Amino acid sequence: PLEPIEPVPDSRLRGVIYHALMEQFIKAWPDCAPVDRRRRFVEISEALLCAQVPWPSHQAFWRSRLRAMADWVIAEEERRQTRGQPLVLEGRGAVLLPELQFTLSAIVDRIDMSQGAGLYLYDYKTGAVPTPDQQKVFDKQLYLLAAIAQQGGFENLQPGEVVEAAFIGLGAAKKYQAAPFDKEPLAQAWEKFKHLIASYQSEETGFQARRALFRVEDY
């Protein structure tokens, strides 16, 4: 579909605002005293809403949602900051597979590094957060981001072990969901991905409109 001529208050815009809020808030975190964190969160969200959401009703609705999740975001961020320090925010990255003449590129929301040089990768979700089973079979986003990170494919990042990759749900159901590396190791998923790309490059492989059914129900 074509892009709308004028901005509309859709889920895409909401995602842009939420991602910008988290990026700016994390950058402000080191200079923000604990007692001032909620106020700073509200200030950043208000500035983004005023600049990008000119519809009063949507502005009021999104404002209430953002303020309602402020305490949860701050509490979760305090936990994350004890594990590692933010190293990459909204970073671009890529990994070249020369034997396949294929480049995997992506934008990662955030990568933290622990004192032991382990990497923690996070992706913000304003919609539904994929379950571990969905990630294992259908949604490989965290796996592919982690594979790029582990090979040092993102800007300002050296190769290192990805200890954990997780979705941070910022929607109505606030949720933290890690990738099931215990059920499917990252190295195994990466080999499967390379095999998939190699099979697609074969003249004998057709491109299916749907690889598998995501959900089956009566209606």
What positions do the PLM features span?
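RecB-family 4Fe-4S metal-dependent nuclease core
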Residues: 1-219
